[in-house]
Amino acid sequence: MQRFGALLFGLALLFPLAGLFARVGPWHWTNGTLDAVRVSLGLTGLAMVIVVALGTPMALYVARAPSRERIIWQAVLLVSVLLPPLALGILLSLAFGTRFSNTSLAFVVTQVYVSIGYYVLGAIAALETVPRSLEVQAGLLGHDPWSVFWRVTYPIARLGFAVALSLAWVRALTEFGAILVTAYYPAGMPVAIWTNLENFGLPAVLPLLVVFLATALPLPWLAHVLAQRRALTHRA
């Protein structure tokens, strides 16, 4: 009975995907669709480079900080995670000024702000799985902090880092509210989906929606599966 209930629950969660097979007329690509894909993938990729470059040292610092300081930093990071996207977009526009709006820079900066908290918090959780004693021993053997990270810390925590990065990727790629305020142009996939829906209806949305889902969902799903497999291997 419990298995049947769980099956129904799972089907209910997946039910929205059935909308991809709804008969709404012939699908068609609209002008600017491919540009929206290029904008989203290219600028989100750049945003992720910045997130990793800034977020990894921050995660290392917070993970090794005294408990009280760690709590404070985690609270600060949670603010960036919990801040409503529309409010964040307005605040960024006010903070950076009107010249900032509707530029590639605005697009990337907004994506960094909406996603870096997810990456840092996930990376902190990954780093907490690394025994501190191993890092100390590596340091005593003469390895500098950079060498300790690459030889000891990262190999143990790499799947956790991958999960954190995949969550940040999805968060940045799918952001709509903040991007709508700060960078309506250049139009990425979320904004293009919305404008196509408003202007042309569902048939114009579905092709881009399929690409959107195909670029957003596989990475976190794969990272989660690999992390679970590794956990099961360690338990065995």
Locate each region found by the language model.
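Short, charged juxtamembrane terminal tails flanking transmembrane helices
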Residues: 230-236
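Intervening/peripheral non-core polypeptide segments
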Residues: 110, 118, 147, 151-152, ...
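Short alpha-helical segment that forms part of, or immediately flanks, the ligand-binding pocket
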Residues: 77, 135-136
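Membrane-water interface segments at the C-terminal ends of transmembrane alpha-helices
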Residues: 1-128, 156-177, 181-184, 196-229
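Short helix-to-coil transition segments within interhelical loops
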Residues: 65, 130, 136-157, 185
